[in-house]
Amino acid sequence: MKVSLIVATGRNGEIGKNNDLIWHLPADMKFFKDTTEDHIVIMGRRNWDSIPRKYRPLVGRENVVLTRSEDFSAEGATVFNDLKAALSFYNQSSERRTCFIIGGAQVYQLALDAGCVEEMYITHIDEEFDADTYFPKVDFSEWKSDVVMEHSHDEKNPYAFTVKRYWK
């Protein structure tokens, strides 16, 4: 099982404000959906809570929610209290799927600190945003990269962005 991370960030690593996204980019949302479909998505409880009820669980993916709360339940998702336990559980599966870490900031930090992330898909949005949540600092010199997609701003996507894949 491969562990990947997927995130969209502003120029300064911004990823959110008030437990919500700070941009609307349908082309990037399509990339996220297409990339994570048929795989496992691991997210923190606040990230789960930020998804509108009508869109959760995320369709076509096995949803996993990490929380410190022992009595938390999430309809349509599996709940774990520990990232390593979740990864161990899915690693024992015979299916060859990827576990995508989809946020938020604390879960990204946990995964990066654990050293389990083998690949990252980062959407770099060419704009600065007012934010209260940021992607953890990463030493990109330790990673190889290639460009997956470049998208100019248009009537549906107000900001230009580039999706890069990083791997070790």
Q: For each of these PLM feature ranges, what is it?
A:
Residues 1-168:
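Enzymes that bind and transform nitrogen-containing heteroaromatic metabolites
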